[in-house]
Amino acid sequence: MPKTVDLPSVLMFINSCSDAELRIINDEIATVMLKSPTISEALLEHKKTSGYECPYCSGKAVKNGKNVAGHQMYRCKDCGKNFTANTCTPLQRTRKNSSTWRTFLEMLLMDATINELTGRCGISQTTAFRWRNKVFDALIELSNNMELQGTIEADETFFKDSYKGNHAVWPAARDSRSRGSSASLRGISREQICIPCLMDSDGKYVAKITNRGKINAPTLSKAFAGNITPGSVIVSDSATAYRRFSKSVGADLHQIPRGKHSVGSLNIQKINSLHSSIESRVNHVHRGVSSKYMNGYIAFTCWKQTHSGSLPELTDQLIADIVKATRVKTCIESSARPFIPVIK
């Protein structure tokens, strides 16, 4: 088994190298980086494999062409709109090269702050924030399209609603709370947002904000009916909402009684672990997240929870996943999203 070396030791070694040795190290790093697919290459490869479709109407009848600058363009024969391979993807309207994007994604996987992303990638704070939301929106789309099957663990977690942001642009719906203070109402109330999380035995997941207050069956059905394969087995706590939900999606239900942690070999430990990761990211890594953007942070946490490997491997996988997105919001659409994105 190869011996692992920690980063501080590597940095100490580099600082002790001569100029000639540093040039050799730099050439080796460049060679390794060239072997990794860039985000642009991954996007084009995905388009070639899956086929080009219109990002506006999902039409399959597409005509090739080029604009006056010689760049590849496409025109939908159904709606008549023009688009490129980057339209409605995280790369839309970006002016940076693929190496900057790769550095950005690596820093994102290391939970870098906005200021750290800005300094390392050479972009502004606004650009870093928008890029992060583009990546998160792509992961939301990936999560919403997942089909869960087999044994599915289901449970919900709650967060206080948050209107963190620029209140000069959009006013808060209530008076501000002191940082770290509790809600004005006891227990689970409309001051809290409900986030159901579902994960199957294959590591597929879906989690999002559904409603204010307690979980309910109609909202569960609207949010997750398209993600559950009929005949699956749902394992949940004793909440009554899961009974009607499981019937509506054609799944069997096994509920764990209050006060117990499992029923036979069935439990919801994966979901409980996911809840801890989401809470840690929201409250400690990012020091509070606006409910407006919460779904993106949930999707990113779920993705990290279900993927493992070295940083280059995780970056390659993240690139391969986000280029599949075809409905990523533009900056204007992103800022115009509802303050509390409940299911209606």
Cite the ranges covered by each PLM segment.
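Residue-level recognition of single "structural anchor" positions
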Residues: 1-344
